[in-house]
Amino acid sequence: MILEGDYRRDGAVCVRQAISDEHLRWATEAIEANLADLSPLAKRASSQDDGAFVEDFCNWDRIPEMEQFIRESPAARIAATLTESSTVRLYHDHVLVKEPGTRQHTRWHQDLPYYNVNGHQNASMWFPVDPVDRPAAIRFIAGTHRGPWYMPRTFLD
């Protein structure tokens, strides 16, 4: 595992080579199963004539591959290390899928205001299961975890 950055200072880091091919396969299978059977919480965050941008939440207890990834991948251990915690609790899983060619961009946002959680030991994790070009990759603004917080919005323009 290669850690790039200072989580406490910046609120985000890049962790490289932490997810094995096997763990990535579990995540990919979980996402495919999720897309084949969306939950009632699922939303389409793109217009109908655009490539699909779909999000879904809270499926780990009904999709075995997702539960396996959450329980057995190093994700929880990484979160514990970054937040300097001896325990980790799952608030929710959140699957975001953008098909190639999707024109809908992901609006700038902060994750913390979406959560009903106080304190500094909160971590969101993002990792692609497919190659992502730099212009399409997630970007972070260092220090925004210290506030002010902005009201959450939908991703759809």
Label each residue range with its predicted role:
Residues 72-76, 122, 156:
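A structural signal for well-ordered alpha-helical scaffolds and beta->alpha junctions
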Residues 18, 116-118, 137, 149-150:
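Active-site-proximal flexible loops/turns
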Residues 17-19, 100, 129-133, 144-145:
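Short loop segments at secondary-structure junctions
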